[in-house]
């Protein structure tokens, strides 16, 4: 069995397979640029591993320990990350399209400018995450926790955010057109210049004072006691745009 220092140099796919076969902990391993397409790494220990620019397409990383790992620019399309621990991971500009991130632990993860289109993040914990300029179009974030997350210029167009928690999140200039935010909690969220056009805001916890600062409310859907006040706000929003 190779000693611990052997993990510091770049590893090849065959070497990774051998180490996994030996039950080795790959925490801190240098896997930059490696292709691990389609491998079963479920439950693997990859804490603080360097996986920058790695091709992890369709890799099974369910329940894997990836705390603090470097996944910058990595390709994780169609990967299974359900239940994985991604706390404090660096995932800037990563491609995570159609990935399964259900119930993943993603506190303080850095996903700036990442592509998460069509990804499933149901019940994922993204508290304090850095998600500015990330692309969540058509993604599923039902019951996800995005409290205190940084969502500047983030794209949530046609995403499902039903029952999501966005308490204290900074959604400045976020693009939410066509999103479903039914029963979401936006208490104390910053929505300055956010686009809520055609958004389903029924039962959403958000104040009219917050929405008065939004960029657009055209076609937004709401009901109950909020309805009249939000209709008036939508008119004010449209008036500002025309002016």
Where are these regions (language model features)?
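Tandem repeat scaffolds
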Residues: 3-243
């Amino acid at each position: 069995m190779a000693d611990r220092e052997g993990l510091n140099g770049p590893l090849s796919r065959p070497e990774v397979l051998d180490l996994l076969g030996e039950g080795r902990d790959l925490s801190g391993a240098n896997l930059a640029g490696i292709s691990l397409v389609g491998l079963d790494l479920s439950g693997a220990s990859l804490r603080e591993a360097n996986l920058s620019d790695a091709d992890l397409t369709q890799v099974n990383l369910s329940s894997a320990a990836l705390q603090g790992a470097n996944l910058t620019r990595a390709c994780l399309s169609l990967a299974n990350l359900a239940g994985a621990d991604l706390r404090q991971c660096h995932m800037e500009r990563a491609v995570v399209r159609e990935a399964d991130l259900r119930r993943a632990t993603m506190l303080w993860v850095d996903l700036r400018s990442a592509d998460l289109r069509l990804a499933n993040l149901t019940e994922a914990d993204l508290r304090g995450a850095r998600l500015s300029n990330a692309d969540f179009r058509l993604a599923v974030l039902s019951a996800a926790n995005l409290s205190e997350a940084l969502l500047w210029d983030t794209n949530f167009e046609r995403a499902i955010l039903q029952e999501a928690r966005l308490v204290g999140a900074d959604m400045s200039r976020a693009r939410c057109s066509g999103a479903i935010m039914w029963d979401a909690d936006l208490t104390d969220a910053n929505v300055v210049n956010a686009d809520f056009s055609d958004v389903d805001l029924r039962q959403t916890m958000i104040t009219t004072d917050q929405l008065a600062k939004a960029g657009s409310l055209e076609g937004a859907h709401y009901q109950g006691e909020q309805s009249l006040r939000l209709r008036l706000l939508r008119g004010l929003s449209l008036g500002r745009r025309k002016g």
